[in-house]
Amino acid sequence: MMVVVLALAGAMSTQVSAQVLRDAAFNSIGRINGNGVVRDGTMHSIGSFDADGKVRDAKGNAIGVIKELEIFDTEGTRIGYINTDGTVHDGESNILGYISINDGKVTDAEKKTIGFARGVRVDWIACYYFFHFFGK
């Protein structure tokens, strides 16, 4: 299981350069670089992902943690997780949406396109689009 989890988490992160985050109309709305720094559409830093799984806001405060495709708040409560097929669930196992491993398309539970994020780790995509860690 650990190998599958690590393979999926890394499946969309083979490049070190910044990857563009896009809305449903394919407009650029931000970037995530290979070091985990998240930037908004005006290139201001709005947070980051640490190597140890911590998710931080623009001021460096911990706002969550990622552990093996599970997402936790700062109190340790699981608020969501991602299946190996890219399905994103909330903490109560309700489907929030989907992340296409093939093309980076992000859709909501009704399969309506909400964005695109190719070349970005799937757990980082979920934190940005579904768990709104960066006010998005």
Task: Enumerate the predicted regions with their spans.
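Long terminal segments
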Residues: 3-40, 44-45, 51-53, 61-62, ...
